[in-house]
From Swiss-Prot:
PROSITE patterns: RIBOSOMAL_S7. GO terms for cellular component: small ribosomal subunit. Keywords: Ribonucleoprotein, Ribosomal protein, RNA-binding, rRNA-binding, tRNA-binding. InterPro entries: Ribosomal_uS7, Ribosomal_uS7_bac/org-type, Ribosomal_uS7_CS, Ribosomal_uS7_dom, Ribosomal_uS7_dom_sf. The gene is rpsG. Belongs to the universal ribosomal protein uS7 family. This is Small ribosomal subunit protein uS7. Signal peptide: none annotated. Part of the 30S ribosomal subunit. Contacts proteins S9 and S11. NCBIfam families: rpsG_bact (TIGR01029).
Length: 156
């Protein structure tokens, strides 16, 4: 770890189409090899597909999906007296969105649809309906935290 001060967090700019910072962060997560234009096209096409399929505003559907994906609790390893315990801790707001976006994009990439735009759109719609792999990931994380509730007093 660095001995110097922690680097300041850089502020992401809101995207031009939806004027939303979380959409910019989604574009950054989808981006591969620095191809931001391609990533933006994928995300915006997915949002258009969501709008056509649901008839609702794509940004609202996306925000509902993110609320259903973002974890409230997670477990962290804590070493006490020579053994490791999985200690449940609350997730900070910044980490909640980061984990939610990471799980959403990873679940989208693992899907079977033909194009990434379709995979992302379907995963967002599934998450908005409380189904899909990304929501399952959140449920598994919460289950793990619940199972290890006995070690909550080791919190730091």
């Amino acid at each position: 770890m660095s001995r110097k001060n922690q680097a300041p967090k850089r502020e992401v700019l809101p995207d031009p189409l939806y004027n939303s910072k979380i959409v910019t962060r989604l574009i950054n997560r989808v981006m591969l090899d620095g191809k931001r234009g391609t990533a933006a096209t994928i995300v915006y096409d997915a949002f258009n597909a969501i709008k056509e399929a649901t008839g609702n505003d794509a940004l609202e559907v996306f925000e509902t999906a993110m609320d259903n994906i973002m974890p409230v609790l997670e477990v962290r390893a804590r070493r006490v007296g020579g053994s490791n315990y999985q200690v449940p801790v609350e997730v900070r707001p910044e980490r909640r969105t980061t984990l939610g976006l990471r799980w959403l994009v990873n679940a989208s990439r693992a899907r079977g649809e033909h194009t990434m735009k379709d995979r992302l759109a379907k995963e967002i719609m599934d998450a908005a309906n409380n189904t899909g792999a990304s929501v399952k990931k959140r449920e598994d994380t919460h289950k793990m935290a619940e199972a290890n509730r006995a070690f909550a007093h080791f919190r730091w």
